[in-house]
A protein has these predicted regions:
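Short, small-residue-biased leader/transition segments that mark boundaries at the very start
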Residues: 3-8
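Conserved oxyanion/phosphate-binding beta-strand-loop segments in alpha/beta enzyme cores
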Residues: 21-87, 225-243, 267-288
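Core structural elements
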Residues: 43-47, 51-53, 296-309, 332-339
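Compact, glycine/acidic-enriched structural inserts
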Residues: 66-87, 91, 131-160, 227-231
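Extended, regular secondary-structure scaffolds
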Residues: 97, 113-196
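Glycine-rich phosphate/pyrophosphate-binding loops
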Residues: 107-131, 321-341
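Active-site cores of enzymes that catalyze phosphoryl transfer or operate on phosphate-rich substrates
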Residues: 156-299, 348-368
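Extended, well-ordered alpha-helical scaffold/bundle regions in very large, multi-domain proteins
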Residues: 307-366
Length: 368
């Protein structure tokens, strides 16, 4: 009966979850040890910035890389179950779509297996692209709810949450030291919260990190608006934040879609660069030496706002001059080109870009 089959499906899902959490316990110790080793060696770290990471299912990959296949297969078979059926309970991580994302995932695998310090940095999409259904012989696109049962391998890192600002205007202010600095006012902001996923190297006890960012409102619920009967305004900030992480490549043949894509790109780049600089400054004093320990690898055009954002942070937050910031930025950013097709090389209307990212637009004008 269908009720009985639902029970068996649930049982398989519960066993998958149990195996995943058991493996995660093993991985966590290696994960911590890996990062302690990198810190001890003061190793240079690559941050691989990409809109996509097509990692596939984690469980099977982790079992192989830990060389634990025989033991886990035997344990599962003792329960009268099939490891392949258990692995099938895991949804594909809806974090990528094509070659761009597969390349990113392959690089992360390879970097971990070779023992290089590396972070993948991207977005924790709620739905990814879409799930295909065929109805009456035609494709129907439905949301891919890959996170509906949670992701047992992810770790929420609240302590690394940071603010990302959109819109507003810039003005110059003179500090107590007499130097003029740019500040941004009248902006709207969202809170970027990272979720870390383990990238397990093959047979070497190395566990690197894929850090995917979720967007949350700075204030979840405005009680004052709700009490005045403005129910939409009460949750407006939440809606604005959640839109950023709903889908990979939202439709951009209208203004709102273009704006959302640019928001997505700036959101994860700003959060990743902010945390990379803070991590560097935990153990080093002079941000001008950043290129000795940090490099940002930009996977195609989507994360290239990194150049302007790094300049912005170095000048406006860390008080470097233009020339000092430029010397750091040119040594810190590397780029992977995927295509020269005109339609794939992104362009943004100046009016949209300057309104959404006013300070980055000023910096790009100055670079030009």
């Amino acid at each position: 009966s269908s009720a009985a089959s639902d029970v068996y499906k649930r049982q398989d899902l519960d066993i998958y979850t149990g195996v995943a959490y058991g493996l995660k316990d093993v991985i966590i110790d290696q994960w911590i040890a890996t990062h302690k080793e990198y810190e001890k060696k003061d190793a240079k770290t690559v941050y691989y910035l990409s809109m996509e990471f097509l990692t596939g299912r984690a469980l099977g990959n982790i079992i192989i890389n830990l060389s634990a296949c025989k033991e886990i297969k035997e344990a599962i078979e003792e329960l009268g179950l099939d490891l392949n059926v258990i692995e099938d309970q895991e949804p594909d991580a809806a974090l990528g779509n094509g070659g761009l994302g597969r390349l990113a995932a392959c690089f992360l695998d390879s970097l971990a297996t070779l023992g290089y310090p590396a972070y993948g940095c991207g977005i924790r999409y709620k739905y990814g692209m879409f799930k295909q259904k065929i109805v009456d012989g035609y494709q129907v696109e439905v949301p891919d709810e890959w996170l509906k049962n949670g992701n047992p391998f992810e770790v929420r890192r609240e302590e690394y949450a940071c603010e990302v600002k959109f819109g507003g205007y810039t003005r110059w202010v003179k500090g107590e030291d007499g130097r003029e600095r740019v500040v941004q006012d009248g902006y709207r902001s969202v809170r970027a919260v990272p979720y870390d996923l383990p990238i397990v190297g093959y047979g070497n006890n190395v566990v690197n990190t894929l850090r995917i960012w979720d967007a949350e409102p700075v204030q979840h619920f405005v009680l004052d608006s709700f009490n005045k009967g403005d129910y939409i305004k009460a949750t407006e900030e939440e809606s604005l934040a959640k839109n950023i992480v709903e889908v990979l490549y939202p439709c951009d043949d209208h203004y709102a879609g273009k704006e959302l894509r640019l928001k997505q790109q700036y959101f994860f780049v700003s959060a990743s660069v902010q945390t990379a600089i803070k991590k560097y400054l935990d153990n080093h004093d002079d941000v001008r030496n950043l290129p000795e320990k940090v490099v940002f690898q930009l996977n195609d055009t989507h994360p290239t706002i990194c150049v302007a954002e790094l300049m912005r942070l170095l000048m406006d937050e860390y008080d470097l001059t233009w020339d000092e910031a430029w010397a750091v930025t040119t040594k810190c950013c590397a780029y992977t080109n995927h295509t020269i097709m005109a339609e794939a090389l992104e362009k943004w209307p100046i009016e949209l870009f300057s309104k959404l990212l006013p300070r980055c637009y000023q910096i790009i004008e100055e670079i030009n």
